[in-house]
């Protein structure tokens, strides 16, 4: 779930609520596709993915532990991956045995009826696996996809700004200022007042989409009808309030200005300096967003849970239901997603927050992150993952949230009233669901 988790696909949807966004790239690249054809049962596996992360896991860990298995690996950029996978799954011709599924589109496939059930694998490991990834990977009582990691979201804040304006940089104390969504907005006003208007609580209101989504009680669709959870209406109100009161830096996620806020170099439209108090990011955001783009601020950051439990990103592994190599496919998924020995080594090597609870409990007290001034982020992430509900995720989420972000943008920017924006959103979704 590193490399930057094509969560950036989802991120583009969220950021679209405030500006056109060019999402950051990854190390993905195209590769020629291969076919499983009609092979007899064997240990040969064709694996497709959208990220080089899985390739490294197979090459550096799985293959040495399974020297008798020949793996043919193909990688396709995230935005092209569904278009490559869909036709072969639907036709049954040229399907990979095993493939990765990104959070933005995983439920589409989990609900498709085209995946190999993994119930027997899950039955062996269920007591040691985190709940929410398994909830997302399950449908109608069957498990179809398994994830090796969890990606809970947190709030990362500048210690120096917390000391200056809140009087403390202690994560326990700072959490009190952002403990829920209403308190978060109150603190946005407090920061404005104490800083004489130069400190924005976030650089982009789009950062708040995932926490508000995490606060929902209902999914987007119930009985084939759109449901707008109160948390999503509150998100609309928040976006408008933040825009009107200049509580955010008025830049888009993944934009140059968004990154500038991390470095402390953001300026407003009049070229005045702007301080950015915090960023709401998941596990991979620490290593591949903050540390990568603002190395000069190392030691001036800390982390707390923030206003709501949420997750962001992740990769699930699944198999085609018609694979001729079902036993080998299941063994690969079981190893990569659940194996204690492998995941302990992988977690230590990569820093990834794995979903295996045995491994979490064994290693979580051993971490100290210099970028966070020695704070143990790993232990906190493991705790945050416990409060995430994966049962609200649906295959239609990506398209619905794209429509929603467009209407939130129109409302926040004063182009539509809230009523107009909601009515247009409802019309778009109704057409989609028909």
Say what each PLM segment does.
Residues 2, 8-107, 123, 327-331, ...:
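Conserved N-terminal structural module of periplasmic/extracytoplasmic solute-binding proteins
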Residues 119, 123-124, 137-207, 219-253, ...:
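Helix-loop-helix "hinge/cap" segment bordering the ligand-binding cleft or interdomain interface
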Residues 7-8, 162:
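N-terminal export leaders
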Residues 82-94, 111-112, 162, 185-190, ...:
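Short helices/loops that flank or line small-molecule/ion binding pockets
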Residues 102-154, 163, 182-185, 298-305, ...:
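Hinge/lid segment of periplasmic solute-binding proteins
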Residues 115, 287, 310-311, 315-398:
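Mature extracytoplasmic/periplasmic domains
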Residues 53-54, 370-429, 433:
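C-terminal capping/gating helix-and-loop segments adjacent to ligand/active sites or protein-protein/ligand interfaces
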Residues 80-84, 217-293, 298-300, 327:
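Extracytoplasmic ligand-binding clamshell segments of periplasmic binding protein
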């Amino acid at each position: 779930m590193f490399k930057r988790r094509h969560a950036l696909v989802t991120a583009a949807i969220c950021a679209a609520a405030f500006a056109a966004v060019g999402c950051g790239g990854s190390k993905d690249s195209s590769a020629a596709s291969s076919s499983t054809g009609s092979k007899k049962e064997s240990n040969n596996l064709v694996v497709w993915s959208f990220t080089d992360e899985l390739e490294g896991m197979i090459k550096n860990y799985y293959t040495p532990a399974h020297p008798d298995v020949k793996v043919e690996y193909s990688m396709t950029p995230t935005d092209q991956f569904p278009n490559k996978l869909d036709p072969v799954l639907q036709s049954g011709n040229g399907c990979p045995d095993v493939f990765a599924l990104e959070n933005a589109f995983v439920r589409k496939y989990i609900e498709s009826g085209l995946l190999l059930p993994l119930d027997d694998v899950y039955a062996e490991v269920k007591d040691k696996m985190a709940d929410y990834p398994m909830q997302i990977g399950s449908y109608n009582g069957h498990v179809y996809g398994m994830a090796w990691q969890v990606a809970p979201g947190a709030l990362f804040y500048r210690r120096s700004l917390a000391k200056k304006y809140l009087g403390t940089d202690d994560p326990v104390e700072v959490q009190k200022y952002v403990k829920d969504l209403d308190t978060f907005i109150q603190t946005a006003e407090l920061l404005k007042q104490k800083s004489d208007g130069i400190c924005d609580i976030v650089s982009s209101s789009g950062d708040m989409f995932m926490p508000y989504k995490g606060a929902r009680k209902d999914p987007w669709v119930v009985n084939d009808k759109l449901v707008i959870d109160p948390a999503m209406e509150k998100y609309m109100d928040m976006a408008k309030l933040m825009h009107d009161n200049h509580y955010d830096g008025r830049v888009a996620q993944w934009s140059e200005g968004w990154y500038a806020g991390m470095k402390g170099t953001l300026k407003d439209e009049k070229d005045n300096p702007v301080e950015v108090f915090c960023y709401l990011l998941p596990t991979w955001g620490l290593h591949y967003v903050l540390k990568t783009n603002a190395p000069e601020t190392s030691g001036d950051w800390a982390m707390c849970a923030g206003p709501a439990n949420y997750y962001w990103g992740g990769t699930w592994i699944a198999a085609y239901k018609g694979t001729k190599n079902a036993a080998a496919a299941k063994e690969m998924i079981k190893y990569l997603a659940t194996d204690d020995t492998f995941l302990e080594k992988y977690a230590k090597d990569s820093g990834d927050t794995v979903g295996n609870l045995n491994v979490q409990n064994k290693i979580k007290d051993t971490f100290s992150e210099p970028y966070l001034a020695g704070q143990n982020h790993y232990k906190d992430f493991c705790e945050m993952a416990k409060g995430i509900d994966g049962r609200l995720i649906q295959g239609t989420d990506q398209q619905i949230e794209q429509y929603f972000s467009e209407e939130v943008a129109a409302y926040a920017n004063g182009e539509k009233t809230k009523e107009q924006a909601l009515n247009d959103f409802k019309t778009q979704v109704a057409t989609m669901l028909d």
